[in-house]
Design a protein with these regions (language model features):
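Active-site-proximal alpha-helical scaffold in enzymes
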Residues: 1-34, 66-70, 77
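Sec-exported extracytoplasmic/periplasmic mature domains
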Residues: 13, 78-85, 140-144, 166, ...
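Structural recognition of the beta-strand scaffold that forms the well-ordered cores
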Residues: 18-22, 30, 39-40, 67, ...
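Glycine/threonine-rich beta-strand-loop-alpha-helix active-site module
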Residues: 25-51
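A short helix-breaking turn/cap at a secondary-structure junction
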Residues: 42-130
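Short helix-loop capping/hinge segments that flank enzyme active sites or metal/cofactor-binding pockets
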Residues: 104-118, 167-192
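Short helix-loop-beta junction
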Residues: 128-145
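Short connector loops at secondary-structure junctions
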Residues: 141-160
């Protein structure tokens, strides 16, 4: 449940594989990972190549690791990071990426960190609310500062993302179909 990478998340959660690769424009790695109790990482656009991924939004599309443990997700994150001449966004990661992200795992890593939290998202499920409350208490205990984003966020942040997706979708699909050449099932989105 919860997004286009749900199959990948279920496969990891059911121990059918150690790790999987999901794709995300707007929640399709993070939401299924959350729903299936696994780790999902949405890398910055350009850290991983998007070659071969059917596009929805060139400014938001990315692939990312899904795993049962954070360490496994970090290993996969580093294994696939790199420059791809077929994806110009990957040039942005030159000098800003690593082959080993496990080195950044630190049991004291929350100390001094600021973590935003939208309290208005509470109230839909008592058990989930209790788990979130416990997690916030744990993060505070580990030295994190929890910031109530209600006083910062205004409007509807999801709306902007959806507008961008709607704007970029047609051109992205048309370019993807064009790049398929003779193998394309349709010449453009309208024909599709």
């Amino acid at each position: 449940p919860c997004g286009s990478s749900s199959g990948s998340a279920v496969a990891v959660s059911a121990n059918l594989c150690a790790v999987a690769i999901g794709t995300e424009t707007w929640g399709s790695i993070m939401c299924p990972s959350n729903a299936n109790g696994i780790v999902g990482i949405k890398p910055t656009v350009g850290l991983w190549s998007r070659t071969g991924i059917i596009p929805i939004s060139h400014t938001q599309d990315t692939a990312g690791p899904m795993a049962r443990t954070l360490k496994d997700a970090c290993i996969l994150l580093g294994a696939i990071t790199g420059i791809d001449s077929s994806d110009s966004k990957t040039i942005l990661s030159k000098g800003n990426s690593y082959n080993d992200y496990v080195q950044f795992l630190n049991k004291n890593g929350l100390k001094g960190k600021k973590i935003g939290y939208l309290k208005s998202e509470e109230g839909k499920n008592f058990k989930v609310d209790m788990l979130v409350s416990d997690a916030i208490s744990f993060m505070r205990k580990m030295g994190a500062e929890i910031i109530d984003l209600e006083s910062i966020v205004t409007g509807t942040p999801h709306t902007d993302s959806r507008i961008v997706m709607s704007y970029e979708f047609k051109d992205g699909i048309n370019k993807y179909l064009d790049d398929l050449g003779k193998m394309r099932p349709a010449k453009d989105l309208n024909e599709l």
